[in-house]
Regions:
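Carbohydrate-active enzyme catalytic cores, enriched for enzymes
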Residues: 1-100, 158, 282, 287, ...
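CBM-like, beta-strand-rich accessory domains located in the C-terminal region of large
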Residues: 6-7, 14-17, 21-22, 112-114, ...
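Short, surface-exposed beta-strand-loop junctions and turns on beta-sheet-rich folds
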Residues: 63, 76, 107-109, 173, ...
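Short, surface-exposed loop/helix-turn segments at secondary-structure junctions
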Residues: 71-75, 110-117
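Catalytic-core segments of enzymes that bind and process phosphorylated/nucleotide-bearing substrates
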Residues: 94-96, 107, 133
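Catalytic Cys-His active-site segments of thiol-dependent hydrolases/isopeptidases
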Residues: 101-106
Length: 328
């Protein structure tokens, strides 16, 4: 471990950019250090950091721009494994300058007597991704401090019609009945987001299969796969979740039994947030399609055989098959 006193505030990301700007003179670092008040924005909008497993696409660097982030790290052993949450496939959405789907944070460490809370914030439940049987992603039976998670990036592309991040991972491969997760996130014009999940495997046993969505501060209600969310700025969104098998739904907010619907911005600090859970009890395979769109925007999803479709205003249709994404 190296003891360092730079940057000036280890808990503030902008301090790192400030130090980098002072060392390099780069105006994009100055832009980040001053939250856009000085300097110039980065020339590039979309970034893929494959070793770190961070994939980000955005519309721009202004205060009313949007971005989405998909997480897909490579894990094996040591501190990278020990400090990583069960969040492969996690997606965050920031629309028009505010968080919509968010990360729940860390809350507390194992040295605390609140180990059930530590387990929750580490788990897939506290992230916007697939949960299976409360299995810790990548763990191998009988092997400690090793998590064999591998993520494959299928596509990271932008064209005139959409932005796409497409990954798959083996986080549930080491269960007795192995399962695999592929997730595609598509951003369409007008901040329409499509999240497609394909869960496959040997499919011999029944499982507790869930999708979790943790919303930023706001209000969430609804039922039967259609939900209304009002953001902190009072903007209204609609989320629909469906699958090719039966789903049950639950909304938690500040729940202590079961633990669910919490966010932590600092150590031992937590506040309630809305959390949506889509549940299926049974065997894989299962195919999910989730659509998040501003209220009143036409975005009608359906699953027909291998294909998932989303019909948009004007009659355009987004089609996702196993090997292709098309909008026409």
């Amino acid at each position: 471990m190296n003891l360092t006193f730079d940057p000036y505030d280890l808990n503030e990301m902008r301090a790192y950019f400030r130090t980098w700007y002072e060392e390099t003179g780069r105006e994009d670092f100055r832009f980040m250090a001053t939250a856009g008040k000085e300097g110039t924005p980065p020339a590039q909008r979309n970034y893929k950091y494959i070793p770190a497993g961070i994939y980000v696409m955005r519309t721009g660097w202004g205060p009313e721009d949007s971005y989405f982030h998909v997480h897909g790290i490579q894990l094996e052993r040591g501190e990278v494994s020990s400090h990583s949450h069960n969040d492969t496939g996690h997606v965050e959405i920031h629309a028009k300058g505010e968080d919509i789907l968010t990360d729940s944070g860390r809350y507390i460490y194992n040295s605390s007597c609140w180990k059930d809370w530590r387990h929750y914030f580490l788990s897939a439940k506290a992230h916007n991704t697939l949960y299976v049987d409360d299995h810790e992603m990548g763990t191998v039976p009988g092997v400690t401090r090793t998590r064999g998670v591998r993520t494959y990036l299928h596509a990271f592309e932008e064209n005139e019609q959409y932005q796409l991040i497409d990954i798959s991972h083996n986080g549930y491969d080491f269960m007795d009945d192995p399962m695999f997760h592929r997730r595609r996130v598509v951003r369409l014009p007008d901040d329409v987001y499509v999240i497609e999940d394909r869960v496959t495997g040997i499919c011999r046993e029944e499982h507790d299969i869930r999708l979790y969505y943790n919303f930023a501060f706001g209000h969430l209600d609804g039922e039967n796969g259609k939900f209304d969310y009002t953001s902190q700025k009072g903007r209204r969104y609609t989320m629909t979740v469906q699958a090719d098998k039966k789903l049950d739904f639950e909304i938690l907010e500040g729940s202590e039994d079961p633990i669910g619907g919490w966010i932590s911005y600092g150590y031992a600090w937590r506040k309630p947030i809305p959390q949506l859970i889509a549940k299926h009890s049974g065997k894989a395979p299962i195919h999910f399609i989730t659509v998040l769109a501003p209220a009143g925007t036409r975005a009608e999803a359906a699953i027909n055989g291998d294909a998932a479709t989303v019909t948009l205003a004007g009659g355009k249709v987004l089609t996702l098959t196993e090997n292709a994404v098309e909008l026409r």
